[in-house]
């Protein structure tokens, strides 16, 4: 199996065997680093990190990871450079076409990691994902998705690694992805969509629990159903949180809204009626302690 040079844009691009190999390698690297074993596998390598959006955990985990592996993470603030833009969306003296940025950076570094969603693409669902794919088209080095408006594959990889560490297996593990309240309507679907894909792909019994109005991408749901059938596991969508949480090994609460809400000013006010959808004091009793 050769994973060298591969992009990591969405989990579905990789096979189950490839993801399990990545998880095994992550296990080994964590053990080596904690045990004082040198892990300088990326000595003299550079990863360019382009953050169109704010980040605490993702940025610092990427920077720390590159340091631990002996390389350097070079942070690029799009407001301090000519902002990468798709063809037809350029602004004179402000942006630079993605095709040019990608080809310049791939001559200087070994990977380009990008976070982009929301305002930089006018909250157009799929716009940021298209930008990352444009980078992949023009770059000869790996393009890594640090979250776009559709997927957050590295977060999903960390999530399923945690499941593996805690339970040792995915088979028979009930993984519940639950919508949770937030006063902001500017929350992309990337995290929940990648989480349920990762859990379903690796064989968890996966439940998506949400209000009827908070549907995820139909293509993501179809992918989860396919993986569940392939693994002999289950995937279901529920609007009953109390029922969904019963017997769960993992309950993952996260807020998201549908793309239509980004453009609907009145939605913010209707949104508040879901504020009590998750009542932690009640539902915690239904979660099996592990």
Q: Language-model features: where?
A:
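Glycine-rich phosphate/diphosphate-binding loop of Rossmann-like nucleotide-binding domains
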Residues: 52-70, 164-253
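Phosphate/diphosphate ligand-binding glycine-rich loop within oxidoreductases
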Residues: 40-164
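Short, flexible loop segments at the rims of nucleotide/cofactor-binding pockets, characterized by
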Residues: 88-93, 122-123, 184, 229-233, ...
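A short helix->loop->beta-strand "cap" motif at the edges of active sites that frequently abuts
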Residues: 139-141, 204, 284-290
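Positively charged, low-complexity intrinsically disordered leader regions
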Residues: 1-60, 64, 151
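Rossmann-like adenosine-cofactor binding region
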Residues: 225-290
């Amino acid at each position: 199996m050769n994973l060298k040079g591969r992009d990591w844009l969405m989990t579905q691009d990789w096979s189950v065997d490839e993801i399990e190999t990545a998880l095994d390698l992550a296990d080994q690297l964590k053990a080596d680093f904690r045990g004082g074993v040198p892990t300088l596998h990326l000595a003299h390598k550079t990863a360019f990190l382009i953050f169109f959006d704010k980040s605490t955990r993702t940025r610092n985990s990427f920077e720390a990871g590159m340091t631990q592996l002996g390389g350097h993470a070079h942070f690029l603030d799009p407001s301090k450079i000519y902002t990468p833009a798709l063809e037809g969306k350029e602004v004179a003296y402000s942006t630079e076409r993605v095709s040019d940025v990608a080809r310049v950076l791939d001559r200087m570094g070994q990977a380009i990691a990008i976070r982009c969603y929301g305002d930089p693409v006018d909250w157009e669902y799929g716009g940021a994902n298209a930008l990352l794919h444009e980078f992949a088209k023009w770059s000869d080095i790996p393009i890594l998705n640090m979250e776009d408006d559709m997927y957050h594959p590295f977060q999903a990889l960390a999530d399923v690694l945690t499941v593996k560490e805690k339970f040792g297996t995915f088979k028979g593990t009930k993984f519940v992805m639950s919508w949770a309240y937030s006063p902001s309507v500017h929350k992309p679907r990337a995290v929940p969509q990648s989480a349920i894909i990762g859990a379903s792909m690796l064989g968890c019994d996966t439940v998506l629990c949400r209000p009827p109005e908070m549907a995820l991408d139909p293509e993501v749901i179809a992918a989860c159903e396919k993986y569940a059938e392939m693994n002999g596991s289950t995937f279901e969508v529920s609007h009953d949180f109390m029922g969904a949480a019963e017997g769960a090994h993992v309950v993952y609460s996260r807020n998201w809204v549908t793309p239509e809400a980004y453009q609907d000013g009145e939605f913010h006010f209707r949104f508040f009626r879901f504020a009590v959808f998750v009542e932690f004091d009640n539902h915690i009793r239904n979660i099996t302690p592990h």
